[in-house]
A protein has these predicted regions:
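Cleft-lining beta-strand/loop regions that shape enzyme active-site pockets
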Residues: 47-61, 65-82, 135-138, 144-152, ...
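Terminal targeting/pro-maturation regions of precursor/exported proteins
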Residues: 2-3, 23-101, 134, 412-413, ...
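PDZ/PDZ-like peptide-tail recognition elements
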Residues: 88, 100-138
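Low-complexity, intrinsically disordered tandem-repeat tracts enriched in small/polar residues
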Residues: 1, 13-20
């Protein structure tokens, strides 16, 4: 075959064009990888501010990441979506720190801001992550989620068809909030059932129920606290005074399924029972220790107290329980709590993405991070109401559930409250011992 000069020139042009295209792709990958490496090191080395030796370790990890990215680019079965790979890496990086830390892409951050400023209505439930999915820690009694049939410990498999496994907790919260009267559809999973069930929830401004108060037998005053909004500690103080006027000689403080509110209200509530000692303290790597100590002038009762907790006890309620337990002020009865107590910082990035980063944790008086260790009662008693309702154990893998709306019909009536009964027994024994 005869090859002319013109043919050779054309062939060389094609080869040159192909090389340029290849170089362009490599350059694009290199730029993305470099950008991600810089961002990763900023997070690992800058925000965390580790020592030089640790920085060397961070550099080594970035080298490994660069090698992995190179292998993906060169050997993956098809040309990869590098932007998707890096986005997934950033989400995974932040979410591997703790449930409350999140990476929001520019699009996600825009949506997050819109939902946060678009309305204060939500579903009336505290939601965290479990098994990698969004999970209901506790619902507010009488709130939208409760009325729709959502239950404590439900796994939210998806929101509006979007898997919660694929999004950050911040995005979950954004999706669940919105305008008053708007609806959101969630698919929930419960144990020992066939399939996830869809529940439609009408968002609303959630009113926290008032503190429950009543007198029980043997001069026991009973208080039920569903959440810790601003001013809750003052309401609790008033209820304690009312119970004492009614002749209460002992107090049961029920914090089961109390999972939301302001940590400051938890501190103030604990102080009602303590005249000395540390209630809690905040601390982070770059967050100086901030101790919250009991103020003797704010202690209003010396009555024996027993605190009820379960897996739905989180946040401010855990601060109260840990303070009373570790200052030997009273007994904690029930299940191990959820474990949630930290402070987050929103950090906007140059590309309009954002990080939500945990910068400090709340610690019990003895130095246990509440978010990591939770609060273990000194008197462990399984929640008989949850066992009767068929809710999963802490380590039990969830499975799909019954149809929504069946909650009120299927929930057992007159369930014996083993935890409350044990609290009454503990208080009686303490009284007999003088």
């Amino acid at each position: 075959m005869k090859i002319t000069v013109k043919d050779c020139s054309l062939e060389r042009a094609k080869i040159k064009k192909a090389k340029i295209k290849t170089m362009s792709t490599k350059l694009k990958v290199t730029v993305i990888a470099s950008s991600l490496a810089i961002l990763l090191f900023t997070i690992v080395g800058g925000f965390v501010n580790v020592r030089a030796s640790s920085n060397d370790g961070a550099y080594r990890q970035l080298s490994v990441y660069s090698e992995v990215l190179s292998r993906i680019r060169l050997e993956y079965v098809e040309e990869p979506n590098i932007a998707g790979v890096t986005d997934g890496a950033l989400h995974g990086l932040l979410e591997s720190l703790d449930a409350n830390s999140s990476y929001l892409s520019p699009e996600e951050y825009k949506h997050y801001k819109t939902m946060k400023t678009g309305g204060k209505a939500d579903i009336g439930a505290t939601v965290s992550k479990r098994f990698g999915y969004a999970a209901v820690v506790a619902v507010i009694p009488g709130g939208p989620a409760d009325k729709a049939g959502v239950e404590n410990s439900d796994i939210i498999e998806s929101i509006e068809g979007k898997s919660t496994h694929d999004i950050s907790l911040a995005e979950v919260h954004a999706l669940l909030s919105g305008e008053v009267g708007s609806t959101v559809t969630v698919a929930v999973v419960r144990p020992r059932r066939a399939e996830p069930q869809k529940i439609v929830i009408a968002r609303n401004i959630v009113a926290i129920p008032p503190v429950g108060e009543k007198m029980l037998a043997d001069n026991v005053g009973y208080l039920q606290v569903d959440a810790f909004p601003e001013g809750e500690s003052q309401e609790i103080a008033g209820k304690i005074r009312d119970l004492q006027k009614q002749g209460a000689k002992k107090i049961v403080l029920d914090l089961r399924n109390s999972a939301s509110g302001a940590e400051s209200e938890g501190v103030a509530t604990a102080n009602l029972f303590l005249d000395h000692g540390t209630i809690t303290y905040l601390q982070g790597q770059k967050y100086p220790r901030q101790a919250f100590n009991a103020d003797p002038s704010k202690d209003i009762t010396k009555l024996p107290v027993a605190v009820l907790v379960n897996r739905g006890t989180a946040g401010p309620a855990e601060i109260v329980a840990a303070a009373i337990l570790e200052n030997a002020r009273g007994d904690i009865i029930g299940d191990k709590t959820f474990g949630d107590g930290s402070v987050q910082k929103l950090i906007e990035m140059p590309d309009n993405s954002a990080l939500i980063l945990s910068i400090a944790k709340y610690y019990s008086p003895s130095g246990k991070a509440i978010q990591d260790a939770a609060v273990t009662p000194n008197v462990l008693v399984a929640d008989s109401t949850e066992e009767e309702a068929g809710l999963p154990d802490e380590d039990e893998q969830a499975a799909p559930s019954e149809k929504p709306g069946d909650k009120k019909d299927e929930k057992p009536k007159n369930v014996q409250d083993d935890q409350l009964n044990k609290a009454l027994e503990v208080l009686k024994n303490r009284e007999s011992k003088g």
